């Protein structure tokens, strides 16, 4: 069985963001994924895996094989177990289309691709001052070492940057958005569902320097996860406030619902006042409790009886310019299920869909005029030992050869007003725009 060549390096000092992002420079396919203390970077494609409702396609070099899907989670696990490579890590995305598949809805405008993954040719795994270099081919280890030496000489100082001004883009599609909010409120009042998150796509006037945007945005945020990935034609940078699902090698499942928000300013006294307000706002508390209850119900469907516990409840989490109420749940995955069953059960995050999920997902597909694609889906890693880590794709910036955009949304309930919800999305666009660096 094939193995990665590996080499550990201990640095004299921790790498800064500019150095770390520099390891990705000039690559066709890559994914940088920050998970707590570890930053993992997969570069180049050794194996490509595309998943739709109908089939799983595996590409290794020029060899292509396909597996018909009978039961998605079981079939995907079976395909991955057949990979002839030791201790691999897979990087990839789950599109919002997974939610429609999971709840038995036609893909509609979301398209057929559910997952896209790649197992990289080379990798860096960075943890503090320790760096692990990995390569399928021994001769590429020299390239990895050389690149690492180059970026270590590059201190954290930037050339003059041109920030993208939000300008008129914050008002993009104003009347459309107010109309769909009103439609959502009407459907909630008629009893179709309790809550739905409705979003609008906002095109940007300039192409972006995604490397500088990632560095600048990461400095301004305290995310649960961050990522910068380029896969095929799509490039995405994001600062995720929460994970949809985490599964460790011992089959422990975790999820981390956030609901309830206040601003986070530069004034500690103001922040303390807002935090206290958040902890005593009955509407925010009720909204959070409903989200935790739904997460618990979903966990119980895939975890062993009596193993699901709330390990943290209603803690205040700081995320850049906002603070949220956050809770954490843990359970033990049932013996006959795998990590993909856990992800599919918890996907999409209630934060980005609504309550009940199926009815909210159906409404999103019907009311919003454009497909979400990766927005409100997941960027993730998956290891050969079954470990999975899936970040929620919010607070993200997207770019292809044709366009650059952000997408913002708001949670709609029966008391929502179109004007207030539109203002909330304006605030989110303005907040994101402060982190964007235009391409020169």
What kind of region is each of these model predictions?
Residues 92, 124, 191, 245, ...:
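A residue-level signal for conserved active-site and pocket-lining positions in enzyme catalytic cores
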Residues 1-63:
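An N-terminal JmjN-like helical accessory module and its immediate linker preceding a catalytic domain
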Residues 11-14, 38-41, 97-101, 204-206, ...:
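Flexible loop/turn segments at secondary-structure boundaries
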Residues 35, 40-50, 196-286, 301-307, ...:
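An anion-binding catalytic pocket shared by soluble metabolic enzymes
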Residues 1, 5-8, 126-152, 246-320, ...:
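Cytosolic ligand/metal-binding cores
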Residues 325-440:
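Conserved hydrophobic core element of enzyme catalytic domains
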């Amino acid at each position: 069985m094939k193995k990665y060549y590996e080499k550990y390096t201990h640095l004299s000092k921790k790498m800064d963001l500019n150095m770390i992002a520099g390891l990705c420079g000039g690559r066709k396919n890559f994914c940088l994924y920050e998970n707590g203390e570890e930053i993992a970077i997969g570069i180049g494609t050794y194996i490509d895996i595309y998943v739709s409702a109908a089939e799983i396609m595996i590409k290794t070099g020029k060899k292509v094989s396909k597996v018909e899907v009978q039961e998605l989670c079981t079939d995907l696990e079976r395909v991955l177990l057949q990979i002839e490579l030791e201790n691999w890590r897979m990087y990839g995305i789950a599109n919002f289309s997974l939610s429609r598949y999971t709840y038995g809805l036609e893909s509609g405008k979301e398209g057929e691709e559910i997952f896209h993954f790649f197992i990289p040719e080379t990798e860096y795994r960075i943890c503090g001052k320790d760096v692990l270099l990995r390569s399928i081919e021994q001769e590429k280890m020299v390239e990895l070492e050389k690149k690492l030496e180059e970026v270590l000489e590059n201190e954290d100082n930037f050339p003059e940057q041109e920030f993208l001004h939000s300008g008129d883009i914050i008002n993009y599609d104003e009347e459309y958005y107010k109309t769909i909010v009103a439609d959502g409120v009407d459907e909630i009042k008629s009893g179709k569902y309790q809550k739905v998150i409705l979003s609008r796509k906002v095109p940007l006037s300039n192409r972006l320097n995604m490397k500088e945007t990632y560095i600048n945005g990461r400095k301004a945020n305290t995310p649960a996860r961050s990522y910068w990935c380029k896969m095929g034609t799509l490039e995405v940078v994001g600062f995720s406030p929460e994970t949809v699902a985490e599964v460790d090698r011992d089959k422990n499942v975790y999820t981390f619902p956030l609901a309830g928000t206040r601003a986070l300013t530069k004034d500690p006294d103001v922040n303390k006042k807002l935090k206290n307000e958040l902890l005593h706002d009955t509407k925010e508390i009720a909204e959070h409790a409903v989200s935790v209850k739904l997460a618990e119900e979903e966990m119980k469907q895939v975890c062993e009886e009596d193993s699901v516990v709330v390990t943290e409840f209603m803690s205040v989490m700081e995320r850049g310019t906002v603070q949220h109420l956050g809770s954490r749940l843990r359970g033990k995955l049932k013996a006959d299920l795998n990590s993909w069953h856990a992800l599919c059960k918890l996907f999409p995050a209630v934060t980005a869909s609504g309550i009940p999920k199926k009815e909210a997902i159906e409404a999103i597909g019907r009311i919003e005029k454009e497909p979400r694609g990766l927005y409100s889906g997941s960027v993730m890693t998956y290891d050969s030992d079954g470990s999975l880590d899936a970040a929620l794709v919010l607070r993200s910036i997207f770019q292809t050869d044709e366009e650059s955009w952000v997408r913002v949304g708001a949670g709609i309930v029966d008391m929502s007003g179109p004007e207030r919800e539109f203002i909330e999305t304006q605030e989110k666009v303005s907040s994101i725009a402060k982190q964007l660096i235009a391409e020169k």
